[in-house]
Design a protein with these regions (language model features):
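Carbohydrate-associated surface elements
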Residues: 16, 35
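A short, well-ordered alpha-helix in the C-terminal region of glycosyltransferases
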Residues: 226-229, 233, 240-254
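Short hydrophobic beta-strand element within catalytic cores of glycosyltransferases
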Residues: 180-183, 197-202
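C-terminal alpha-helical cap of glycosyltransferases
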Residues: 257-273
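Conserved donor-binding/catalytic core segment of Leloir-type glycosyltransferases
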Residues: 49-66, 72-76, 87-89
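Acidic anion/phosphate-binding donor-loop and adjacent secondary structure
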Residues: 36-52
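Nucleotide-activated donor-binding/catalytic signature segment of Leloir-type glycosyltransferases, i.e.
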Residues: 100-145
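Acidic donor-binding loop of glycosyltransferase active sites
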Residues: 149-166, 179
Length: 273
């Protein structure tokens, strides 16, 4: 805090982040959300990359904070009654020690093995956690320009994250292309959610501190059954899901990098006057 008070300005990436600093007596704090590349992430026509499958996308580096354990638990139950369900994911994590935090979850067992060339073996891990072979696809580390292609193949996206300091760029990109998105209603995600642009996860409990995260105030534990309920709703009512996806894209329409950088530079200009 002593060092923070010495800065002329602190810029945060979410309202939650800003409020934490203000609650600790820092008054020189402003908020600027990150932007989206709208030349790539915009409402696009659904492709048929995975025909005859109900495809669910999950993105973000594998770790307890990102709650892929919740995705796995919910998908396992959903796929048991919908054999055509397919989980596609981009969970690459360049920080193995952070990835190991997923073992903190009681919903899954073990962690993926990492080869000598630092490749993560998701297949055996997911199968050992009850996902049938052929029910999931690891997208690896696709280039950002390739992501709209994969998102356009999905019927839904799931982000049950326990905490987001910012606003979760992958979730923003999924919403911007018009996907029906299941989104945990906590921390930075709250800046993305309105009454009708997603399927919010509101049934949440407190998170207990765990290494290396000693402070988890504001974090929230999502409810697996609520994720499952939303997946069933999207599966059954595709018209409403499409409408929510369209409203999601509209709500993210102003989050262009041009707009966000202009706002950022405005604060810097004010500081220099």
């Amino acid at each position: 805090l002593e060092r923070a008070h010495k800065y002329d300005l602190i810029i945060t990436g979410s309202t939650w982040n800003q409020e934490i600093l203000k609650a600790r007596g820092l008054t020189h704090v402003v908020n600027v959300f990150q932007g989206i590349d709208h030349t790539l992430f915009k409402p696009i026509r659904v492709n048929n990359l995975f025909p005859d499958r109900f495809t669910i996308f999950s993105g973000g580096q594998l770790e307890y904070r990102k709650a892929q354990d919740v995705v796995i638990a919910a998908f396992k139950e959903f796929q048991a009654t919908h054999n055509e369900a397919l989980l596609i994911f981009a969970w690459a994590n360049q920080w193995p020690l952070i990835m190991l935090t997923i073992a903190n979850s009681p919903l899954i067992k073990g962690v993926p093995e990492i080869s000598e060339d630092n490749k993560i073996n998701y297949s055996s891990w997911l199968e050992s956690n009850g996902l049938p072979e052929g029910s999931f696809i690891d997208l690896g580390t696709p280039a950002n320009r390739e992501m709209p292609y994969y998102l356009a193949s999905a019927d839904a996206a799931v982000f049950p994250n326990r905490c987001e300091a910012g606003t979760n760029l992958v979730a923003m990109e999924a919403m911007a292309v018009g996907l029906p998105v299941i989104l945990s209603a906590n921390t930075g995600h709250l800046d993305l959610i309105n009454d009708s642009n997603c399927y919010p996860l509101a049934k949440q409990a407190a998170v207990k501190p765990f290494k290396p995260y000693a402070g988890v105030d504001g974090w929230a534990e999502p409810d697996v059954e609520e994720v499952l309920t939303h997946l069933e709703t999207i599966y059954v009512n595709k018209v409403e899901a499409t409408n929510r996806g369209q409203r999601a894209a509209q709500s993210l329409g102003n989050f262009t990098w041009d707009n966000q950088i202009r706002e950022l530079l405005g604060f810097v200009d004010d500081l220099c006057r």
